[in-house]
């Protein structure tokens, strides 16, 4: 049975580890939903505001470049034609394209369950509580000292909480490699990018309800 230890403000651990409910660890790790979930998230970032100039939108070229006959060249009516350098683009991208993809709820839950299972079984995942958050007093200096004591300074740290704490948010806001996320806002990609995961104890109960 998987176990997690509660980490304290001085970087040490509680002696008694917390046993995880069997339902938190997926019986089967499904990688395809994980891939799909990350793809959907990244696709949602695309704004679709790209825009090229068509032949009718390129400035200039209103005058015929040279006379119709007796030049030995093919006849041309405008330098805005697509085959001229600086001319309009044919069938290029225009704004308001929707790049978003869809993933059904069951597949998204399977993706989260798979990634959470891998993280909860990892040695880089620990438990935290509101007591630790309050002891930071909202100070970056105290949080930095905690990360140093816990040997997490050089890692991408993700705090996952069930209740947002002002002291925690303030103490981590100026630290580049530290993120604080509410459980409902954590994505598959967030979990995968985290080298160290610090999970509030109450999150475990919420996850049991989500994955049962």
From Swiss-Prot:
Residues 61-73 have a biased composition (Basic residues). Changing residue 70 to L: After 32, 37 and 48 antibiotic passages; confers resistance to various antibiotics in combination with a 23S rRNA mutation and up to 3 mutations in protein L22. Keywords: Antibiotic resistance, Ribonucleoprotein, Ribosomal protein, RNA-binding, rRNA-binding. InterPro entries: Ribosomal_uL4, Ribosomal_uL4-like, Ribosomal_uL4_dom_sf. Residues 55-86 are annotated as: Disordered. It comes from the Bacteria. The keyword DNA-binding does not apply. GO terms for biological process: response to antibiotic; translation. One of its GO terms (molecular function) is rRNA binding. GO terms for cellular component: ribonucleoprotein complex; ribosome. PANTHER family: 50S RIBOSOMAL PROTEIN L4 (PTHR10746), LARGE RIBOSOMAL SUBUNIT PROTEIN UL4M (PTHR10746:SF6). Belongs to the universal ribosomal protein uL4 family. One of the primary rRNA binding proteins, this protein initially binds near the 5'-end of the 23S rRNA. It is important during the early stages of 50S assembly. It makes multiple contacts with different domains of the 23S rRNA in the assembled 50S subunit and ribosome. Part of the 50S ribosomal subunit. NCBIfam families: rplD_bact. This is Large ribosomal subunit protein uL4. The lineage of its organism: Bacteria, Bacillati, Mycoplasmatota, Mycoplasmoidales, Mycoplasmoidaceae. The gene is rplD.
């Amino acid at each position: 049975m998987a176990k997690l230890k509660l980490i304290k403000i001085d970087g040490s651990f509680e002696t008694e580890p917390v046993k995880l409910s069997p339902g938190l660890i997926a019986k089967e790790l499904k990688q395809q939903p994980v891939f799909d979930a990350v793809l959907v998230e990244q696709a949602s970032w695309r704004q679709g505001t790209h825009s090229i100039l068509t032949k009718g939108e390129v400035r200039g070229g209103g005058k015929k470049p040279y006379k119709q006959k007796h030049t030995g060249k093919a006849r041309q009516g405008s330098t805005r034609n697509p085959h001229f350098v600086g001319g309009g683009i044919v069938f290029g991208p225009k704004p308001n394209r929707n790049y978003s993809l869809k993933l059904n709820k069951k597949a998204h839950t399977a993706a989260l369950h798979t990634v959470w299972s891998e993280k909860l079984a990892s040695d880089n995942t620990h438990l935290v509580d509101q007591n630790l958050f309050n002891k930071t007093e909202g100070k970056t200096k105290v949080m930095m000292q905690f990360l140093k004591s816990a040997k997490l300074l050089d890692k991408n740290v993700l705090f996952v909480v069930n209740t947002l704490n002002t002291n925690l948010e303030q103490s981590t806001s100026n630290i580049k490699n530290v993120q604080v996320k509410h459980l409902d806002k954590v994505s598959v990609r967030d979990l995968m990018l985290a080298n160290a995961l610090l999970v509030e104890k109450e999150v475990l109960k919420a996850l049991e309800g989500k994955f049962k």
